[in-house]
């Protein structure tokens, strides 16, 4: 009960007391000075350091993003260039194939023409040789026939029989 009486005598906690206000203010200022002297600087430094770290992280992220975009653009350009190069290689290969095909076809036609010409020349030579041989045989047979006619001094009927037999010999000799 005694404690209740002290509270009642002093007027309560919510009543303004000038001594209490003074000492509370002095204590607050001392604590504020101590905080400012010893903790405020390191706290501000830590906050500034954190702010710089966050800003650096944002700057690095922005740089990385720009670098990634540059690499992406470069890769797109390289891909487009590779596609163009592939198209060029395909086109050149096709042109080379067409050119090679034309050359081979031309060579084949020339070779065929040469072979045909050679065969015709060979046929003509064989034909001339056969004709020469035939003329020689006909001349020989004619000479033989003339010799027989002259030697036999035969009549017209016998001469005709001799010529016919020589023609038959020639026909048989040809076959």
Curated annotation (Swiss-Prot):
What keywords does the record list, in alphabetical order?
ATP synthesis, Cell inner membrane, Cell membrane, CF(0), Hydrogen ion transport, Ion transport, Membrane, Transmembrane, Transmembrane helix, Transport
Q: What does this protein do?
A: F(1)F(0) ATP synthase produces ATP from ADP in the presence of a proton or sodium gradient. F-type ATPases consist of two structural domains, F(1) containing the extramembraneous catalytic core and F(0) containing the membrane proton channel, linked together by a central stalk and a peripheral stalk. During catalysis, ATP synthesis in the catalytic domain of F(1) is coupled via a rotary mechanism of the central stalk subunits to proton translocation. Component of the F(0) channel, it forms part of the peripheral stalk, linking F(1) to F(0).
Organism for this UniProt entry: Chlorobium phaeobacteroides (strain BS1)
> One GO cellular component from the entry?
proton-transporting ATP synthase complex
Q: Which HAMAP family would you find in this protein's record?
A: ATP_synth_b_bprime
Query: InterPro entries this protein is in?
Result: ATP_synth_B-like_membr_sf (IPR028987), ATP_synth_b/b'su_bac/chlpt (IPR002146), ATP_synth_F0_bsu_bac (IPR005864), ATP_synthase_B_chain (IPR050059)
Q: Which residues cross the membrane?
A: 19-35
Q: How does it assemble?
A: F-type ATPases have 2 components, F(1) - the catalytic core - and F(0) - the membrane proton channel. F(1) has five subunits: alpha(3), beta(3), gamma(1), delta(1), epsilon(1). F(0) has four main subunits: a(1), b(2) and c(10-14). The alpha and beta chains form an alternating ring which encloses part of the gamma chain. F(1) is attached to F(0) by a central stalk formed by the gamma and epsilon chains, while a peripheral stalk is formed by the delta and b chains.
Its gene name is: atpF
This one is known as ATP synthase subunit b
Name the SUPFAM superfamilies on file.
Answer: F1F0 ATP synthase subunit B, membrane domain
């Amino acid at each position: 009960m005694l404690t209740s009486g002290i509270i009642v005598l002093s007027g309560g906690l919510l009543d303004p007391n000038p001594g209490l206000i003074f000492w509370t203010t002095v204590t607050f200022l001392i604590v504020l000075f101590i905080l400012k002297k010893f903790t405020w600087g390191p706290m501000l430094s830590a906050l500034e350091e954190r702010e710089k770290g966050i800003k650096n992280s944002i700057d690095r992220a922005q740089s990385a993003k720009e670098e990634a975009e540059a690499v992406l653009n470069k890769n797109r350009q390289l891909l487009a260039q590779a596609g163009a190069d592939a198209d060029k290689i395909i086109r050149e290969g096709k042109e080379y194939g067409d050119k090679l095909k034309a050359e081979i076809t031309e060579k084949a036609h020339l070779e065929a023409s040469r072979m045909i010409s050679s065969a015709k020349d060979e046929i003509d030579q064989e034909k001339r040789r056969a004709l020469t041989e035939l003329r020689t045989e006909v001349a020989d047979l004619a000479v033989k026939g003339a010799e027989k006619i002259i030697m036999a001094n035969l009549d017209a009927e016998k001469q005709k029989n001799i010529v016919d037999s020589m023609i038959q010999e020639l026909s048989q000799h040809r076959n």
